[in-house]
Amino acid sequence: MASLDNFDMAAGRTDGVADCVAFPGRFSTWTRALILAASAAGGGAAALAMDAAHVALVLGLAAFAGGLLSTWSPCGYSSISLLRPTGKGARAVLDWLPTFATHGLGYALGALILGTLLGAIGGIAGLSGFATSFGLGLLAVIGLAYGAHQLDFLRVPYPQRRAQVPHDARQRFPKWVVGGLYGLSLGLDYLTYVQTPLLYLVTAAAVLSGNVAEAVALIAIFNLGRYLPVAVNLLPVTDYQIQSWLGRNQERAAIADGAILTAVGAAFAMLALA
């Protein structure tokens, strides 16, 4: 649940992202505790109807949700704002479609690179899949720990490169080129600050798979969730309306993040112990 209070939009530099030290009070401690308990109970109950074959489906859904929730990161706000069509009307939207396309291609390339690296690491380490007892146990710990982190009951290390894409690129290249560069930078997922620990869950699953194809697929699903929100620029809404809506729902996004992590962690814990 990081704040954007210290988010610097100055062009011509890579922006730093400071840690959050204060949290909005929209959700009381009791409310967050109830969400934590309900999520854990829901995940545990769901595990009763699951087997190893369902693990990949759950991870895929969690990856997509994580990608969507990463919109509430500094780069999520920025990519929607900075890659907007120039002008108004149907013609402006048509002229913007190449930017939208190259942005998606950048995300796809990022998924291919990162997924290949993670899958190869798992393969070299001799890991044989995320549905093993060890794999499920590790994913359960990550989900439960970072779920409590997002719900502000636990402080867990959050190692990331606290930086943003360099804004001066839009001064030097056509917008469709910038779209591709931003997509690649964001699609590598660890070059910029991503405000959802679901990325760690997906990363761990990709390594645990020990399989390049499965790892690429997981990262691609996460990146698809990151990419699609930019499509809001196809709609007749202003940048102010979009940014205001994101700002109003910042805390809700963090709560949803924590609930998903907790539910997935509880489900995988039950499967690991079965």
From Swiss-Prot:
Where does the UniProt annotation locate this protein? Cell membrane
User: From what superkingdom does this record's organism come?
Assistant: Bacteria
Q: Chief subcellular site?
A: membrane
Q: Does the keyword Cell membrane apply?
A: yes
Arranged from A to Z, the UniProt key words for this protein are: Cell membrane, Membrane, Transmembrane, Transmembrane helix
Entry keyword annotation includes Transmembrane: yes
Stretches that traverse the bilayer = 30-50, 52-72, 105-125, 127-147, 176-196, 202-222, 253-273
Q: What is this protein called?
A: Methylamine utilization protein MauF
Q: Which organism's genome codes for this protein?
A: Paracoccus versutus
